[in-house]
Design a protein with these regions (language model features):
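Active-site proximal beta-strand in glycosyltransferases
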Residues: 60-74
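C-terminal amphipathic helix plus adjacent low-complexity
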Residues: 257-261, 265-341
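Nucleotide-sugar donor-binding catalytic core of glycosyltransferases
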Residues: 1-37, 43-56, 77-239, 288, ...
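Short, acidic/turn-prone active-site loops that include or flank metal/cofactor-
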Residues: 73, 119-122, 251-254
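Generic anion/oxyanion-binding catalytic loop in active/binding sites
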Residues: 173-176, 209, 245, 266, ...
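Residue-level signal for the nucleotide or nucleotide-sugar donor/cofactor binding architecture
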Residues: 215, 251, 285
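Residues that mark the start of a beta-strand
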Residues: 61, 136-138, 245
Length: 341
């Protein structure tokens, strides 16, 4: 979240708390009127303040047989602030939250049924198989980072002649978002160790100490890198990824380089972790499975084209060396929705 969107989101939260009518405002979008009926109205928002864009779509509820919404980021400590906005969700048949710890307080703010929908990844694009490019990048530290860990890795990389990749500019836009994701996948498929910490690990003033699983875990495992970092202290983390999927270290870890050198003494374990992560992404965390959860909530099923993608994902998973039939996903149990067929 950049500073402008941060200020906008906070301002709307405060206004909606004291002025309920804010929830009926159109923030400036061109008004659209649905002129025919649809089977499903699907809305995906990053923040609760984005819900105001619904006011720019006339007759969306009357014209759509079912309606499902996804809210990526809503922290439990913020639910009371957005009660005015939450009433916009009452018309949905189901609401999915990307923060599992927020389900209980949200259920008290909205009458809409709600459940957890974890982040996902384009597992087919990120999969390193069958090509298996050489992992020439020693460490990839993407996005928010600990200055302590970063300084330690810089010195370690200089001393040992390792390749340490990290962000050097603060960019909020991309020339081409599809090319950006393609390049990210290419980097991770060539990375040995990928740093992943609990979502917004360094912004406790936003999370109020709530620990959630962020996108980095899904991207890193899908690309076959070994995850290193601070996982969220939540009971469902292992149900999402399985045991021994990452090397837990403090978010602030000045001697991480030495830890990585010690891990390299057991290449067999690292290879098992890599293949477990890739297999897990292909069978549990591709966006196909998230979309299937959305459709299930609406009483709908996947298209034949989506089923073809499922077959391709299973075919890639078979290349990891473990029979697909022996890998049973308990993701849907963690998400509190039925397991996909």
């Amino acid at each position: 979240m950049d500073r402008v969107s941060d200020l906008t989101d906070r301002g709307l939260r405060k206004l909606s708390r004291v002025i309920p009518a804010v929830a009926s405002l159109n923030p400036g979008f061109t008004t659209t009127c649905l002129e025919r009926d649809y089977e499903l109205f699907f809305a995906s928002f990053q923040f609760m303040s984005d819900l105001l864009s619904l006011n720019a779509v006339r007759d969306w509820r009357r014209r759509c047989r079912k309606a499902v919404c996804v809210i990526d980021e809503l922290w439990a400590g913020r639910v009371r602030e957005v009660r005015g906005l939450a009433r916009l969700l009452d018309d949905f048949d189901h609401v999915f939250l990307g923060c599992r710890g927020s389900l209980e307080p949200f259920s008290k703010a909205s009458s809409a049924p709600c459940s957890y929908l974890p982040p996902g990844v384009d597992a087919e694009r990120f999969c390193p198989l069958p090509a298996e490019p050489a992992r020439v990048i020693d460490v990839f530290n993407m996005g928010r980072r600990s200055p302590v860990t970063h300084r330690g890795l810089l010195e370690w990389a200089r001393r040992t002649n390792r390749w340490y990749i990290f962000d050097t500019v603060n960019l909020r836009t991309f020339q081409n978002h599809a090319e950006h994701r393609m390049r990210l996948a290419d980097f991770i498929k060539r990375t040995r160790f990928f740093i992943a910490n609990q979502a917004k690990f360094n912004r406790s003033y936003e999370t109020f100490g709530q620990e959630e699983v962020g996108f980095r875990f899904f991207e890193g495992t899908a690309g076959g890198a070994v995850l290193v970092g601070k996982p969220p202290d939540t009971p469902h983390f292992e149900s999402l990824f399985g045991p021994d999927v990452m090397v837990p270290v403090p978010a602030e870890c000045p001697d991480l380089g030495s830890i990585l050198e010690e891990l390299e003494r057991d290449p067999a374990r690292l290879e098992r972790m890599r293949m477990q992560g890739v297999r897990c992404a292909l069978l549990r965390h591709d966006w196909l499975y998230r979309w299937e959860s959305v459709l299930q909530a609406a009483g709908m099923t996947l298209t034949p084209q989506a089923e073809e993608r499922r077959s391709r994902l299973k075919g890639l998973a078979a290349l990891t060396g473990t029979p697909v039939e022996s890998v049973r996903s308990d993701l849907m149990a963690a998400a509190a929705v039925p397991e996909p067929s």
